[in-house]
Amino acid sequence: IDMDKYTLDAVLRKGAELVKRKGIKCLVIDPFNKVRDINGNESGDVNVYTLEYLSKIEIFAKKYDVLVIVVAHPTKMYKGTDGKIEEPTMYNIKGGGEWYDASYHGLLVHRDYEAQTVKAKVLKVKFQNLGENGAEAHFSWERRSGSFVPLADINNDDPMPWEDV
C-alpha cells in the first residue's frame, strides 16, 4: 500500500481534481485517523493537529463548494452501570474539543447491539435553520434489502422542525 496516497493533502488534491473533472459535490474522508496530515503540527499537540486538519478541510470545502464529511470514530468506549456501551459525543474523538468547536455539524451514529438498533443523533448544528440539536432517528437493519429501516413510521403530513406550524 502506498501510504503517500492517504495523506490529507493528497486526498484534497484528488478531490479538487474530481470537482473539476466530474463535478463532485461531496467528499467523504473515512476514517479520519487513516488519512494523515503529514505536513501539519510540528509540536505534537493533538488539539493543534486536529484544528489544522479541520481548517484545511474547511478551506477546501469553501473553495470548491463541496460538502466534506469526515468519519471519525471515538476512542474506546466502556460499558456504563447498566451494562450498555455509553453513547459517545464529539469529545470522545481524539482531539475532541476541536471537533466540537471547529466543525459546523456533528452527527452520531450509534449501535445498540442488544436491541439490534441504530440511532442517528444530531450532536451539533451551527446554523439552526439546518437542523435541531439533539434530534434523533432510530433504525433497524433489514438483512434482506441490506438497508436501514426507520423503527417508527414517518407521517409525511407532520411538519418538519423548521417549518412554522
Could you tell me what each predicted segment is?
Residues 46-47, 86:
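A generic secondary-structure micro-motif detector
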